[in-house]
Amino acid sequence: KAPKSEVKIIDTIKYINPIIDKVVIGSYLKSLKVSPFLYGKLYTYSEDDYTITNTISSKLIEAMTCKLLPLIRDFQPDILIATHSFSTEMLSVLKSKYNMNIPCMSIITDYYSHSSWLHPYIDAYVVSNEDMINKMIFKGISKDTIYNLGIPVKPEFNMNYDRGETLESLDLCESKFTILVMGGSLGLGKIVDIYKQLTNINEDIQIIIITGKNKKLYAELSKIKDSSSKETRIIGFTNHVNKYMQACDLLLTKPGGLTITEALICKIPLGLFSPIPGQEEKNAQFLLRHNLAVNLTDIEKCSENIEKLLHSKNELKNMIENCSKFSKPYAGDDIFDLINWLVQNKSDKSSFPKEEKIYEKNNPKTFFKSAEKYFLKTALKLFEL
């Protein structure tokens, strides 16, 4: 839409300090593996704005934000956009502490507005559904800054693919009920247990499983497939998830924000398993509340619950209709229009801090070094648990 525009995309924490990025990601993945319950408790606990955790986190983010200033000054952007809660808080710090009068937008990529996303100096919040708005207003966010435009996904999800051709390319039957199983690009969740349950269903179904980059999972499923009576196709990493979604009748998946959005656009009812405690559990609650999904977290009852759904054509039809109601296939276009409006009405490049001013406030050279050391020390302790 704007071929002459220049866009710079950065992984914020990685750009600031690759070591901190590795520790953060490593600690996050380890906490999910070792104690997902504890992670969920921390997520819930941090909803309170005044916890020790949030206070420490805010101070560290404030200290790290100064490292973005040279990049911003050199690039001279018309607008800053964040798609993560850390980055959103950094944008708020940039406006409040460094008086940068350029528009800042945050796109919340889940179906629940956790407090970690909500900060006072953001000009526009893009959300995925109406349910989020009242919570945000209660937390002090102005209604005038909240835009229910949806989560943007790849344009390919708006392209129509022929179900018959896709299934034929996999040597599957177009008339059979087709179930797609996914666990994200890493193939996470209890996919093996889910597949074993699917093989017990007393209906003529066929199964497609996408394992992403998880080669171990691919090999394990392939062994089970050899002794299964259900027609099954196992696919590794693919760039054609949209084609497979449009070819299936039911998607079994973890409730990640982007996967949910893609499924709603493709009008596919969902079966939810292995939600990450915290944000994915909140996503699941939204889907179940609006009859967009069935709950498969009790793996032992997975085949029973899917059979019930197969026997209720009206229920499936209602779920598909609900997907249409909550789908926002043109979110990307609508967000682009909002970006244009913000740039035209709120951008002031003269407010960029001068080079000599960048390191003056709070003596961030010294402050950042001490904060960085403290963060690494704290995160490494968590990583060692």
Residue ranges of model-derived segments:
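Donor-nucleotide binding loops and adjacent catalytic segments primarily
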Residues: R163-E165, L172-C248
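A nucleotide-sugar donor-handling region in carbohydrate enzymes
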Residues: D123-S185, N214
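A short alpha->beta transition loop at the rim of the catalytic pocket in nucleotide-sugar-dependent
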Residues: C248-D249, K267-P269
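Acidic donor-binding loop of glycosyltransferase active sites
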Residues: Q246-G256
